[in-house]
Amino acid sequence: MKAPDSPRYEFGGPLGATGIVFGLPILMQVLYLGCNDVSGCPAPALLDPKTLSWAKLKSQIPWPQEGLSGFMSWEVTRWLFAYYFLSLMLYRIMPAQIVLGTKLRESGKPLEYRFNSFSATVVQLTGCAIGTYIYGANFPVWTWITDHYIQLLTTSTVLTYIISIWTYLRSFSIKPGNPELREVAVGGRTGRVIYDYFIGRELNPRVTLPFFGEIDIKAWLEMRPGLTGWILLNCSFIAKQYRTYGFVSDSIVVIALIQAYYVLEGQYSEAGLLSMMDITSDGLGFMLTWGDIVWVPFLYSTQCRYLSVYPVHLGPIGVGAIGTVFCIGLYIFRSSNNQKALFRKDPNNPAFANMTYIQTKRGTKLLTGGWWGMARHVNYLGDWIQSLPFCLPTKAAGYVILPAGTAVAGAEVAKMLDGRLVTPGDAAPWGMLFTYLYSAWFGFLLIHRERRDDYACSEKYGKDWEEYKNKVRWRVLPGVY
């Protein structure tokens, strides 16, 4: 068995980290340019590789007129920083729940956290709701977001590099036994610069600012700007669909509501973050920073962005089916997690009278009945099922935008207010590469987390964990994986 302090590589080690650090930002730009409101999703030129040329592709994508310099602007930078400043203000002035985290590895002491992201998001959404009531779909916030999407994406990416480089360099000022309780994450002390920068070196970097006080950067980024921004992006795409077609489709409303619930429920239960590996084990590096402020808001809103250009009509049966899938996933996720939490708190509760468990040498018990007798991480199965309704409303995605006056007919043809037509054409189902990427990625992420958890539990419980795995054979999906 490895010593606890012996780091091990994840995500392909230094080579994989290099690919992610420099490749993912390019991928996000490609996803936006390739699935667009100019020519189609994917852009028609991409469907014919034999005749593909840069000149042809450039004419079919929203490439800025200014060229590369158009990917950023000082105006967008100022407003993005204003958004972060607003989030900081709400963090500081609104009532908050003060919670102690888990005990740190080296000092054995907990850090204090301030949580009020739910109420802060509600305030921001309320303000936008009032603005929408006054201005309708032309509310300046909604039009500005969709008009400056590429600049917002690029500026957020640059901000990711700034934050992650700063936290990496700052981590070398940590001294053993420091009174600020600063620690280096176990996984971020390999000595390989690119890997440690990617995975995160300092466990819980904090900064003290005038008026705002002490801020845990990792927890703040995890629960605030990206998650709230995800909802705001979705709302801006709903408004765009209305401006484009004069109506709002049931599909975009269903996705926006489900995703808003997902975000708000997580923010309402913000204190639950403190037991997650993101907080207890992972340092703050490129991986978490990028995920929090770029990957989550911009990738996870792809479906609403798609539907803003090509509305899909589900009908009552379709809406009911999507809602049912979400509720099933939510039930599995919540029920299994609640069962585990209750067992940890009160293993002698009558609810566990007929359930089996393993008594470990550490003195704790591992539940091998109920949900946790079906799979070691059955909660991850529920979480993944919850992700499917984010993508399913886009159906067999893909569309081509045709000029006004084009002679084409069919039930799946949508006509914009400016006369342009949108039809699946040869693009379907290639658009699924864009709209279903989230669900595929989330499945990969959960499998990766399960592997990390398995390693951590093996280190923690030793032979007891091997016994547990013999009794509970399946990792996530009973009978399959």
UniProtKB/Swiss-Prot annotation:
Q: GO terms for biological process?
A: ergosterol biosynthetic process
Q: Which residues cross the membrane?
A: 11-31, 80-100, 125-145, 149-169, 244-264, 279-299, 313-333, 427-447
User: What InterPro entries does the entry give?
Assistant: ERG24_DHCR-like (IPR001171), Sterol_reductase_CS (IPR018083)
Enumerate the Pfam families for this protein: ERG4_ERG24
Asked whether the keyword Metal-binding is assigned, the reply is no
State where the protein is found. Answer: Endoplasmic reticulum membrane
Q: What happens when the gene is disrupted?
A: Exhibits significantly increased sensitivity to amine fungicides, including tridemorph, fenpropidin and spiroxamine, but not to non-amine fungicides.
Query: In the Enzyme Commission scheme, what number(s) does this protein have?
Result: 1.3.1.70
Keywords (A to Z) from UniProt: Endoplasmic reticulum, Lipid biosynthesis, Lipid metabolism, Membrane, Oxidoreductase, Steroid biosynthesis, Steroid metabolism, Sterol biosynthesis, Sterol metabolism, Transmembrane, Transmembrane helix
Q: What's the name of the protein?
A: Delta(14)-sterol reductase ERG24B
What taxonomic ancestry is recorded?
Eukaryota, Fungi, Dikarya, Ascomycota, Pezizomycotina
**Name of the gene:** ERG24B
